[in-house]
């Protein structure tokens, strides 16, 4: 599959989301963040919602002609989508909306925009952030989150260890 074809598909699916859906997704993110350390919880929710809305609007405003039409690794794309499906814990309508939007935003970020799956302005526990150096991104938690449920292997970020 080519990047423009994927972008058109993602953009079309994005049109199914309303402000009501975004409000439900925020509710889900707040609920899902309940186990984060209190000092990070509010920041995490705010940063993730800001990035979600920025990415949402970026897709809406971008035209297909702006997309570099390179080949997308469909096997990796399908693995990412399957992992997102496995995020389910609660089987609630707000979680369903979150899953469906993640299946649009994450492939866009990873395969088309080539941006991190978390925003650069998100502070992770330990008071660390993603660092951009030149055209490369370095993540402080990438090596700590590589498991069958994470999306880290699809993210453009390199491990921060590569900076040292």
Swiss-Prot record:
Tell me any Pfam family this protein matches. Answer: DUF2115
Look up the signal peptide feature and give its range.
none
Question: What is stated as this protein's family in its record?
Answer: Belongs to the UPF0305 family.
Q: Which HAMAP family match?
A: UPF0305
- Specify the protein name: UPF0305 protein MJ0646
Question: What organism is recorded for this protein?
Answer: Methanocaldococcus jannaschii (strain ATCC 43067 / DSM 2661 / JAL-1 / JCM 10045 / NBRC 100440) (Methanococcus jannaschii)
